[in-house]
């Protein structure tokens, strides 16, 4: 619930003004059009009429997403997994929310099952529910690393709070609670086991900040000087990316943090809301890519159908998402 609420709250206008913040670096000038950014539709299986690419592994080997099969007027969800030009379709009601895939082709997602949110994993052709602690009323996955460790969070109805969760790859069928600041939610897990997420500043506080938990247990907060709130939405390599604002429902500014220093840099508003970050620190927004030397808009909008939505990016800069015309078309962007 926490991650979904943060993502929804972050979805504000792309042209929000970004004031300079005390103690915060402001990115350089915007220089559009410096890159040859190309759009490539992804193939859909026979009988699947709509599709969205929502996840890609850092190497670009696998892309995962959601399709729709219409049978006798009934729209049925389909889990889609691309490997190059080949696409695998899995008809399942669990394909409501596909949030991650790693370089081994393990896909993770969430679905509403028997009156509660439940996480799942697709691996080696099998869909399985992930275990959840007995004290949570719903659970969500948010990130997976190269070896298959999965992180997310659970909602504890009794205390109206959230706890960060990890499903370790080396202990299949188990789930463990991650020690975090109050009301914690894990958003990403790096290949070395570092976990990144969000939590309240303190118990009872209305302000949020990001956090980084190293494998040894050390926890560092990710904040933006001069702002009461900061939320991490993605992390990879030595970088985290997210958003900052004075009010959870107010204007937002996209931010990049260096995980080694915790330094925050407010970047061009064209990438708000932030969707992903590469190991090299490139930020993906809903409709644009931010590099240190400028911003590149993502092509794909056509007259009457202006919507393109990117969701994830590889470490080599290939982004995936979808375009909207009379149907949803899964796509990838290269050279952006």
Locations of the language-model features?
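Secretory targeting and sorting signals
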Residues: 1-28
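Residue-level hotspots at or immediately adjacent to binding/recognition sites across diverse folds
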Residues: 2-5, 26-336
């Amino acid at each position: 619930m926490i991650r979904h609420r943060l993502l929804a709250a972050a979805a504000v206008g792309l042209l929000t003004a970004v004031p300079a913040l005390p103690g915060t670096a402001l990115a350089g000038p915007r220089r559009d059009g410096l890159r040859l950014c190309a759009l490539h539709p992804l193939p859909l299986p026979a009988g699947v009429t709509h599709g969205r690419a929502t996840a890609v592994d850092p190497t670009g080997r696998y892309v995962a997403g959601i399709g729709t099969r219409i049978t006798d007027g009934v729209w049925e969800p389909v889990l889609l997994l691309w490997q190059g030009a080949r696409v695998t379709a899995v008809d399942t009601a669990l394909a409501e929310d596909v949030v991650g895939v790693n370089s081994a082709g393990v896909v993770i997602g969430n679905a509403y099952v028997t009156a509660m949110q439940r996480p799942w994993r697709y691996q080696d052709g099998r869909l399985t529910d992930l275990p959840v602690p007995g004290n949570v009323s719903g659970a969500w996955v948010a990130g997976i690393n190269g070896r298959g460790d999965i992180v997310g969070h659970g909602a504890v109805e009794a205390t109206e709070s959230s706890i960060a969760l990890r499903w370790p790859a080396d202990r299949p069928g188990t789930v463990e609670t991650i020690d975090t600041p109050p009301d914690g939610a894990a958003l990403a897990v790096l290949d070395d086991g570092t976990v990144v997420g969000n939590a309240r500043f303190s118990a009872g506080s209305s302000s949020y900040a990001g956090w980084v938990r190293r494998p040894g247990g050390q926890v560092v907060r990710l904040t933006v000087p001069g702002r009461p709130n900061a939320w991490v939405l993605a992390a990879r390599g030595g970088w985290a990316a997210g958003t900052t604002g004075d009010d959870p429902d107010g204007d937002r500014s996209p931010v990049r943090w260096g995980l080694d220093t915790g330094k925050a840099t407010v970047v061009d508003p064209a990438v708000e809301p932030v969707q992903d970050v590469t190991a090299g620190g490139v930020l993906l927004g809903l409709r644009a890519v931010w590099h240190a030397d400028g911003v590149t808009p993502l092509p794909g909008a056509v007259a009457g159908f202006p919507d393109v939505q990117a969701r994830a990016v590889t470490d080599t800069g290939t982004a995936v998402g979808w375009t909207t015309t009379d149907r949803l078309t899964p796509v990838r962007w290269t050279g952006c």
